[in-house]
């Protein structure tokens, strides 16, 4: 087979016992591919491993894990300076794998690994919050954030993305909307939000299409606000057609400012960030990513 440049796989420590992954790596190595493997143990490991990847001269750094691992690796990559910055490869090994699923990464590990190593690179956007924290997929606030951050790890491990829905149903009687004001380019809204989705990608929370029109290379963030005084009637309403739905507010902008009279929490690719003021902006063509040719999130 054709020769491919070396890759470095940054593997979430929870996936070290994945036998099919070990077999896929060994098979590709036998075919002549050079694949370095590093395992994360604590926060900050990804930054160190990306620095090592640059010293090794690899062409691709592969994020092996869920949305949080992809976030950590991609954030480390965009912080690199100079030329010859490795591309991002994606190996979906998390609970929900929302970003990987939405961009069309194969579920089969051997196929996903081959794509991560040999796929074509495409420049994609990322988003940054308050000039510090980044996300590649989505920032969610309100009802959805509290569900994803509070769902027990054992439930997620046992049921995957369905666990978010089950835990949400258990908590409906205690969840209240967040009052806030949101501004963007040609956009202004103020009111009570049950769910806020600001997407570079389209889905979060285990497959929920919060921002169905989002693209990862258009220089824009997609905003969706689900409003209403009561959660259950609103959810029933949003199951209907989106057209002319009074409980859905939409917008698109390269930036959004959110202000709240009280502390609210946004979930950034699985990582919570709390505060009263958020400035979220797009970083156009921030990194190169190996994606399938029929990726639905490309313009």
From Swiss-Prot:
Chain's role: Probably phosphorylates lipids; the in vivo substrate is unknown.
SMART domains referenced in this protein's UniProt entry, alphabetically: DAGKc
InterPro entries (alphabetical): ATP-NAD_kinase_N (IPR017438), Diacylglycerol/lipid_kinase (IPR005218), Diacylglycerol_kinase_cat_dom (IPR001206), Lip_kinase_YegS (IPR022433), Lipid_Phosphate_FormReg (IPR050187), NAD/diacylglycerol_kinase_sf (IPR016064), YegS/DAGK_C (IPR045540)
UniProt keyword tRNA processing present: no
Any one of the GO BP annotations: phospholipid biosynthetic process
Binding site for Mg(2+): 215, 218, 220
UniProt xrefs under HAMAP family: YegS
Name the record gives this protein: Probable lipid kinase YegS
Catalytic residue positions: 271
GO CC list: cytoplasm; plasma membrane
Disulphide bond pairs: none
Cellular localisation: Cytoplasm
Keywords, ordered alphabetically: ATP-binding, Cytoplasm, Kinase, Lipid biosynthesis, Lipid metabolism, Magnesium, Metal-binding, Nucleotide-binding, Phospholipid biosynthesis, Phospholipid metabolism, Transferase
Cofactor needs: Mg(2+); Ca(2+)
Family designation: Belongs to the diacylglycerol/lipid kinase family. YegS lipid kinase subfamily.
DAGKc domain: residues covered: 2-133
Primary enzyme class: transferase
Pfam families: DAGK_cat, YegS_C
Binding site for ATP: 40, 66-72, 95
Broad class of where this protein is predominantly found: cytoplasm
The keyword Transferase is annotated on this UniProt entry: yes
One GO MF term attached to the UniProt entry: ATP binding
EC number: 2.7.1.-
Highest rank taxon of the organism: Bacteria
């Amino acid at each position: 087979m054709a020769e491919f440049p070396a890759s470095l796989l940054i593997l979430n420590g929870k996936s070290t016992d994945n036998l099919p992954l070990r077999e896929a790596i060994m098979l590709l190595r036998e075919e002549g591919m050079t694949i370095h493997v590093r395992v994360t143990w604590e926060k900050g490991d990804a930054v160190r491993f990306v620095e090592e990847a640059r010293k090794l001269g690899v062409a691709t750094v592969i994020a092996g894990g869920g949305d949080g691992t992809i976030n950590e690796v991609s954030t480390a990559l965009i912080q690199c300076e100079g030329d010859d910055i490795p591309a991002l490869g994606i190996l979906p090994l998390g609970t929900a794998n929302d970003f990987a699923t939405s961009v069309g990464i194969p579920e089969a590990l051997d196929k996903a690994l081959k794509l991560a190593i040999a796929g074509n690179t495409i420049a994609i956007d990322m988003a940054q919050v308050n000039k510090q924290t980044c996300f590649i997929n989505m920032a969610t606030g309100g009802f959805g954030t509290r569900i994803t951050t509070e769902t027990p790890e054992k439930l997620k491990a046992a049921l995957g993305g369905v666990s978010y829905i089950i835990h949400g149903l258990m908590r409906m009687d205690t969840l209240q909307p967040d009052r806030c004001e949101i501004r963007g380019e040609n956009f202004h809204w103020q009111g009570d939000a049950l769910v806020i989705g600001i997407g570079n990608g389209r889905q979060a929370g285990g497959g929920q299409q919060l921002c169905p029109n989002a693209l990862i290379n258009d220089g824009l963030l997609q905003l969706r606000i689900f409003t209403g005084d009561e959660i259950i009637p609103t959810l029933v309403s949003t199951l209907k057609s989106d057209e002319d739905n009074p409980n859905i507010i939409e917008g698109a902008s390269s930036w959004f400012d959110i202000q709240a009279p009280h502390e609210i929490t946004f979930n950034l690719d699985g990582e919570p960030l709390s505060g009263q003021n958020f400035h979220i902006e797009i970083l156009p063509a921030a990194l190169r990513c190996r994606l399938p040719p029929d990726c639905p999130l490309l313009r």
